């Protein structure tokens, strides 16, 4: 390998065309870029990328093909005070690598240096990029395109969801293959969910601190390679991409969408003491938000923050999202710490990346979900994202928990959240589906732990229980921990049913955490990001079948209520909703201000929810007509017909008018 042809500047990354490979790399401040190719024995050959178009360096290697192992060495100024940290002693991953060989070890040879360059060569231990043939037979695949108003999201971890499932073939448990297996698809269908939202599947790394403690990053929110499927979830690591695509195809055939959690906010290079393995060495000042003193703005809490207002970085991010849609047929994205995407550095609805997505004919048509905050100044941006985005709604989570578990919010506050938080989202042309309602998620207590623990128990994370939020709005019902007497167990069961009913029958887009429908507990750990063990893996043998059936019945009931599926804002007198007191009369101004007590919510005229958040039995007079309790609150063969509901403490019921 003596030289390269000029090649072309687009697309970014290593593109195989059947005859050779085109390499294209963005770096605005580089002075020279070397392509480094490795043989099976690890011997390295270097050659300069010969052409530069604007800020894209590129070249074409004849007769190269899939499996080629490569990296970059990028030359440029070493001027940390100005944000420049070029160090050609460090082998760098292609930011668009479709496959990565090797992990990210805790080894000082990967460090580029803080204020002086580290000249130790890192090639022997650095992860390598690999060329991939992206061809795949998508014939017959048809994205479900489920309307937002009919969407029910199920948030899950590839490994944690499937590793302990006894009916799956042992060889595929914990893998992408398991997601598309008939056993899992049958479960998803019986539960009634419409979309599977996966925690990050792009290749990630464990932080050095965790490695030193013998732990690992389990959730995956520490990205190393945004375009590469993580091989640890593949039964055959060399086929990770195709195994994932096989699963997507199978899920689509069953009418289930696939939404990916993607981390476009920071990288695994962490802070200045972290490794130089990709973006830092390619163009630190362009890829990251750099302070005037040369250090990073840490608006993510992870050591660095991607600068998604730089045109070159915006195009890289856009191509990343297009890869997942075009080549993997995913149906949407959940963006972690998504306020970073809108920073300029202040948050703007017309930030460059938002505009790039809006103008993209493909990305503008998929489901986009924001976690609408980061930890930087002005980072909390709930309901402020562009209209294309739905958003996680922490108001719904907190008010729902406080209503049922702490009884310290008003009926008015609860009703506002139940009605798709219209005070927040009913503007800018947004629909009720813009609020993604949740009572739990991967971070925080599981639903069972919400009713079993008043305090977090994160000692296993190695931070002396300092990590994780202290604002859990939970209630152990008198006994801390899973073990309890029958009276406490019954109160906990009622609270779980009430929270699930609120989640799945409120207006907006519901998101269910995998395992909540089974009674899964993390034993009070509300930040299990580093627990790749039985604490986080769903134990299917211990699942609560009654709770699973209850959850499935609620999801199927949701689809029968027009007020919840039409995706239109409720208006006074439109027949969608009536808010009633225990005597079936409209709530008065004074009653709206009452602390969490009891109320009735009549939906689409024919459906009635009765809610008793008190610790006492409350009799409620139902509205005029003949009402029967419906599953999961009564059996179809023996429906309960009544005019008065004897509401148990912490109780809820749903009726249909005959």
Swiss-Prot record:
Q: Which domain of life is it from?
A: Bacteria
In what pathway does it function?
Glycan degradation; glycogen degradation
Broad EC category: hydrolase
Q: Where is this site: Transition state stabilizer?
A: 443
Keywords carried by this UniProt record: Carbohydrate metabolism, Glycogen metabolism, Glycosidase, Hydrolase
Which residues carry out catalysis? 336 (nucleophile), 371 (proton donor)
GO BP terms, alphabetized: glycogen catabolic process
Any one Pfam family match given in the protein's UniProt record, by short name: Alpha-amylase
- Kindly state which reaction or reactions the protein catalyses: Hydrolysis of (1->6)-alpha-D-glucosidic linkages to branches with degrees of polymerization of three or four glucose residues in limit dextrin
Q: Which SUPFAM superfamilies match?
A: (Trans)glycosidases, E set domains
Q: One GO molecular function term?
A: hydrolase activity, hydrolyzing O-glycosyl compounds
What are its E.C. numbers? 3.2.1.196
Question: Which HAMAP family does its entry note?
Answer: GlgX
Question: What family does the entry list?
Answer: Belongs to the glycosyl hydrolase 13 family.
Q: What the protein does?
A: Removes maltotriose and maltotetraose chains that are attached by 1,6-alpha-linkage to the limit dextrin main chain, generating a debranched limit dextrin.
Please identify the protein, giving its name as recorded. Answer: Glycogen debranching enzyme
Lineage, highest ranks first: Bacteria, Pseudomonadati, Pseudomonadota, Gammaproteobacteria, Enterobacterales
């Amino acid at each position: 390998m003596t030289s390269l042809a000029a090649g072309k500047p687009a697309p970014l990354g290593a593109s195989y065309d059947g005859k050779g490979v085109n390499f294209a790399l963005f770096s605005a401040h580089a002075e020279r870029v070397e392509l480094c190719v490795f043989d099976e024995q690890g011997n390295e050959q270097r050659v300069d990328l010969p052409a530069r178009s604007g800020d894209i360096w590129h070249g074409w290697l004849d007769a190269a093909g899939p499996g080629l192992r490569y990296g970059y060495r990028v030359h440029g100024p070493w001027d940390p005070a100005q944000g420049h940290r070029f160090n050609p002693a460090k082998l760098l991953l292609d930011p668009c690598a479709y496959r990565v060989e090797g992990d990210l070890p805790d080894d000082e040879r990967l460090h580029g240096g803080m204020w002086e360059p580290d000249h130790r060569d890192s090639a022997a231990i650095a992860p390598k990029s690999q060329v991939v043939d992206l061809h795949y037979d998508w014939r017959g695949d048809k994205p479900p395109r489920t309307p937002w108003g009919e969407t029910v999201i199920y948030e899950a971890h590839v490994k944690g969801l499937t590793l302990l499932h006894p009916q799956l073939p042992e060889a595929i448990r914990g893998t992408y293959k398991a997601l598309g297996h008939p056993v899992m698809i049958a479960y998803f269908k019986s539960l009634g969910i419409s979309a599977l939202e996966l925690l990050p599947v792009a290749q990630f790394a464990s932080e050095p601190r965790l490695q030193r403690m013998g732990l690992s990053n389990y959730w995956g929110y520490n990205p190393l390679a945004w375009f590469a499927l993580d091989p640890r979830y593949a039964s055959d690591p060399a086929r990770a991409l195709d195994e994932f695509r096989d699963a997507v195809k199978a899920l689509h055939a069953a009418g289930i969408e696939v939404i990916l959690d993607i981390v476009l906010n920071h990288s695994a290079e962490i802070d200045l003491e972290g490794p130089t393995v990709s973006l830092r060495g390619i163009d630190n000042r362009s890829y990251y938000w750099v302070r005037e003193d040369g250090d990073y703005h840490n608006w993510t809490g992870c050591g660095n923050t991607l600068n998604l207002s730089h045109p070159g970085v915006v195009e890289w991010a856009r191509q990343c999202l297009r890869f997942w849609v075009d080549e993997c047929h995913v149906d949407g994205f959940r963006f972690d710490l998504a306020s970073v995407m809108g920073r300029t550095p202040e948050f703007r609805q017309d930030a460059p990346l938002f505009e790039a997505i809006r103008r993209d004919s493909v990305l503008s048509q998929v489901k986009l979900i924001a976690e609408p905050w980061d930890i930087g100044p002005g980072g909390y941006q709930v309901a402020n994202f562009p209209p294309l985005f739905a958003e996680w709604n922490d108001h719904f989570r907190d008010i729902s928990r406080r209503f049922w578990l702490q009884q310290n919010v008003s009926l008015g506050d609860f009703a506002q959240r139940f009605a798709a938080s219209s005070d927040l989202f009913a503007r800018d042309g947004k629909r009720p589906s813009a609020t993604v309602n949740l009572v739990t998620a991967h971070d925080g207590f599981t639903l069972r732990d919400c009713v079993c623990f008043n305090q977090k128990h994160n000692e296993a994370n190695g931070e002396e229980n300092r990590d994780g939020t202290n604002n859990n709005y939970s209630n152990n019902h008198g006994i801390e921990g899973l073990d309890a007497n029958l009276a406490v167990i019954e109160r906990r069961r009622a609270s779980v049913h009430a929270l699930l009913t609120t989640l799945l029958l409120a207006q907006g887009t519901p998101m269910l955490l995998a395992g909540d429908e089974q009674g899964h507990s993390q034993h009070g750990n509300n930040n299990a990001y580093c627990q790749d063990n039985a604490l986080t893996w769903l134990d299917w043998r211990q699942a609560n079948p009654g709770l699973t059936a209850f959850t499935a019945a609620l999801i199927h009931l949701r689809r029968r209520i027009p007020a919840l599926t039409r995706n239109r804002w409720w208006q006074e007198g439109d027949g969608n909703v009536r808010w009633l007191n225990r005597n079936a009369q409209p709530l008065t101004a004074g009653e709206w201000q009452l602390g969490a007590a009891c109320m009735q919510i009549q939906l689409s005229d024919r459906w009635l929810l009765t809610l008793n958040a008190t610790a006492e039995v409350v009799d409620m007079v139902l509205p005029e007509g003949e009402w029967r309790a419906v599953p999961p609150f009564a059996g179809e063969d023996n429906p309960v017909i009544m005019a008065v509901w004897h509401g148990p403490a912490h109780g809820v019921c749903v009726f249909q008018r005959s």
